[in-house]
Amino acid sequence: VNSNYTGGEPKRSRTAYTRQQVLELEKEFLFNRYLTRRRRIQHTLT
Protein backbone atom coordinates (compact mmCIF):
# COMPACT_ATOMS: atom_id res chain seq x y z
CA VAL A 1 0.00 0.00 0.00
CA ASN A 2 1.37 3.38 -1.01
CA SER A 3 0.94 5.80 1.90
CA ASN A 4 1.30 8.76 -0.50
CA TYR A 5 -1.81 7.79 -2.49
CA THR A 6 -4.68 10.19 -1.75
CA GLY A 7 -7.33 8.55 -3.94
CA GLY A 8 -7.57 11.24 -6.60
CA GLU A 9 -9.45 14.46 -6.10
CA PRO A 10 -10.04 15.63 -2.52
CA LYS A 11 -13.51 15.09 -1.10
CA ARG A 12 -15.89 18.02 -0.80
CA SER A 13 -16.71 19.11 2.71
CA ARG A 14 -20.09 18.04 4.02
CA THR A 15 -22.88 20.61 3.85
CA ALA A 16 -24.71 21.34 7.09
CA TYR A 17 -28.40 21.96 6.39
CA THR A 18 -30.81 23.75 8.70
CA ARG A 19 -33.93 21.90 9.82
CA GLN A 20 -36.03 23.94 7.39
CA GLN A 21 -33.69 23.12 4.50
CA VAL A 22 -33.85 19.41 5.37
CA LEU A 23 -37.66 19.54 5.35
CA GLU A 24 -37.65 21.22 1.94
CA LEU A 25 -35.17 18.70 0.56
CA GLU A 26 -37.22 15.78 1.91
CA LYS A 27 -40.40 17.23 0.40
CA GLU A 28 -38.75 17.59 -2.99
CA PHE A 29 -37.25 14.10 -2.71
CA LEU A 30 -40.78 12.67 -2.54
CA PHE A 31 -41.37 13.89 -6.09
CA ASN A 32 -37.90 13.52 -7.53
CA ARG A 33 -35.61 10.79 -6.18
CA TYR A 34 -32.51 12.40 -7.70
CA LEU A 35 -31.66 15.96 -6.77
CA THR A 36 -28.89 17.51 -8.80
CA ARG A 37 -26.00 19.23 -7.06
CA ARG A 38 -27.31 22.53 -8.46
CA ARG A 39 -30.74 21.91 -6.87
CA ARG A 40 -29.21 21.05 -3.48
CA ILE A 41 -27.12 24.23 -3.64
CA GLN A 42 -30.26 26.25 -4.41
CA HIS A 43 -31.75 24.95 -1.16
CA THR A 44 -28.72 26.16 0.79
CA LEU A 45 -29.23 29.68 -0.54
CA THR A 46 -32.83 29.94 0.66
From Swiss-Prot:
Keywords: Developmental protein, DNA-binding, Homeobox, Nucleus, Transcription, Transcription regulation. This is Homeobox protein Hox-D4. The keyword Transmembrane does not apply. CDD domains: homeodomain. It comes from the Eukaryota. It comes from Ovis aries (Sheep). The keyword DNA-binding applies. Belongs to the Antp homeobox family. Deformed subfamily. Pfam families: Homeodomain (PF00046). GO terms for cellular component: nucleoplasm. SUPFAM superfamilies: Homeodomain-like. Residues 1-46 bind DNA. One of its GO terms (biological process) is embryonic skeletal system morphogenesis.
